[in-house]
Each structure stands twice: as structure tokens, then as C-alpha cells.
Amino acid sequence: MPNIFVEELVHTPIEKQVIEIVERKGIGHPDSLADGMAEAMSRELSREYIRRFGAVLHHNTDETQIVAGRSNPQFGGGEVIEPIYVLLVGRATKFFNGEYIPTDKIALKAARDYIRQHMQNLDPELDVVFNVRLGEGSTDLQDVFRRKSGNVALANDTSFGIGFAPLSETERLVFNVERRIYEEFRKKNPAIGEDVKVMGLREKDRISLTIAAAFVDRYVANIKEYDAIKEELENFVKEISSEYTEREVEVFVNTADDYETGCVYLTVTGTSAENGDDGSVGRGNRCNGLITPGRPMSMEASSGKNPINHVGKIYNLLANQIAARIAEEVEGVEEVYVRILSQIGKPINEPKALSVQVIPKSGYDISKLERPARDIAEEMIANVGKITDMVIEGKVRTF
């Protein structure tokens, strides 16, 4: 493929830089909730289209918005006073081959089910008000969606996706700390809600983790118990951190707490969306699950975009997969960055440019790495349709 470019990148690898900042917004963060509901809607619409017509029809649900509610958390149990407002907005094909599709009903059920499955203390019937506003897509983009080059979809936009590999030590640490708080710590400590944000800062060989963890009021009797659980969480994070790094790790939890005034991070539902924190698709984690200001990132929201021809989703997922394979399979790669640029109306397996930038390890020459890196990129762009199947089956994350 003539549009694949492999070159050496002259740049200080992230592990050798003095400062590194990494963030992850957990499952219950308002931005992550918006991402999750948007992706759930797209996935269920795709499955229903396939069930009815044997193919995914045009849709995008990547503009979902959350407007925070109002609550009165209290030790021992408070209440939600005004429910969270969720606007499920996007485009969907509502009529096809003489048949109407209940897209609003499908989207609403998908969003409610997502909340029910991921938020233990947030009632999607009582604590959330949903408003479904799915319109039809523009005529020109629907036409691009329907047209194909053979069996290959045509790009719906001129856009780009970015990926990199391998993850740094700090990136792996931040990602896994949030994951394990959600999957492990909360099982023994239901007082910790799903809204957990982890901010990592590495200064040379010292890492500090600042964690914002929403406590659920009904499981905490008083401020003394709150403090004990917070200390237990700090110790848990310190303990598991040694599995990901030998560097010194400091852990800070809920640093805005003021015990004298009784102002602590207490919620009724486990998410800050209940009281003042809005959420939007694409404002949180990139599709690798992280926010990494020290790395190139796409501003595209991957969640909710259709998995057939929306390059804002497909190319970001693919770029990360290409980078991961190159880093794993090509000997001598210290870091690799992949950028894929589409051109609207052109086959998605024929990008305008696919750039692979490699930082070789000491003693390795780019000339020895170029061919295997190119071969991996060429193979994966030729099989870009596999991304679609993985998305519909829920086998890849988008945030």
C-alpha cells in the first residue's frame, strides 16, 4: 500500500522525560457515564439493525449529554432531590425497506440497562430523567454510508485516528488502580462509589496518585468511619501499586475534604452527576482508557459513533491496535506512534495516509524495523472490518 509511511521519530521517550501526567476517569464519572450510554445505544441499535435487516444501518449516538441533578447526601443515607437529566441525542435510521424501527425505545432501554448494570446505587427509573432525541442523518452522509467499494465501507468524514504503544509504567499504574478499585476494593467496601478519578504525576522516579472517590452515604455512619475507609483505600492503592512499578508511590484520596466543617466527598448514588457535575461524550478517556497529555491524542469521541464507516471511531481503535502489535512483535521498538488519516467518500481500507513513527531502542536501526512495522500496518488496515465485529460484540473498549 503506497500510503503507509514508516519513519524514525527523534523524541525523548516518555519514560525518560522528567514529568509525566496521566489521568483516568472511572466508570461512574459523568463523562464516562455519557460515553458508556452512547456506546451502549450504538451497540444495541447495530444489533437490532442486523437482526431485522442483516446489516448495520446509519446511526450515531455520540452527542449524549448529562445535566447534573441535585442531592442532599447525609451520613447514614440522604436523598436525590432533583434527578439527573440525560439527553440521548444523535442520528438513527428509523425507516427502512418499508419498516419502521423503534430506535428511541431501543436507545432508551440501552441507556437504562447500562446504568442498571454499572451503577449499584443509581436507580435509572427514579434518579434519572431520560429525553430521547434521535433524528435522521443528513441525506449526503446516509448516501455515503450506503455506498461501498466492493464490500468495504466509505469513510464518512475526513478525520484521523491516533494510537501509541507501549503504555508507560505510569499509564499502566493509573489504568489498573482505577480498574481494581472498581472491580476489587468496592466488593469489600460498598461505601466507595463508581465515580473514581485517578490523576497520576511522575516526577523523575517519584509517582503521586491523587484519587477522587465518591463515597456512598448509606454505607458510612459518620466522619470517623469515612476517614477509616479512606485510609483503607489509600493502603489498598499503595499495596497494589508495587505490582506495576518499583518507583516510590504517594497516594492522596479526596484532598478537598475538610473534617472541621464536615465537608467531605459524600454522595447518595456513587456519582458526582447527582449534584453539580455534568457529563459529555468525548470529554473523558480516549479509547485506550486514558487521558495522556504527554502523548499525541485525537479529540474525536470514539463512543457512540457507528462502527461501519465512522473513522473517528474505527481509526482510533485501529491505530492503537496497530501500535500495540508493532510494539509487541517488532524487536527493537522503544515507542511507536500511529496516525491514520481518512478522506471522506474513500474506502476505509485505503487511508489518505497511515503514518508509523518509531523510536528505536538503543543499538537498533530504523532500517531494520521499517519492513516488519509496515507489514503489520498493511495487514491490519486491509482487515479493518474486523474492528466493526469487535465493537458490536463488545470486545473493545472505547473509553
From Swiss-Prot:
EC number: 2.5.1.6
Catalytic activity: L-methionine + ATP + H2O = S-adenosyl-L-methionine + phosphate + diphosphate
Cofactor(s), by name: Mg(2+)
A GO term for molecular function: methionine adenosyltransferase activity
Single Gene Ontology BP annotation: S-adenosylmethionine biosynthetic process
InterPro entries according to UniProt: AdoMet_synthase_2_family, AdoMet_synthase_3, S-AdoMet_synthetase_arc
Similarity section: Belongs to the AdoMet synthase 2 family.
Function, in words: Catalyzes the formation of S-adenosylmethionine from methionine and ATP.
Protein name as it appears in the record: S-adenosylmethionine synthase
Gene this chain is encoded by: mat
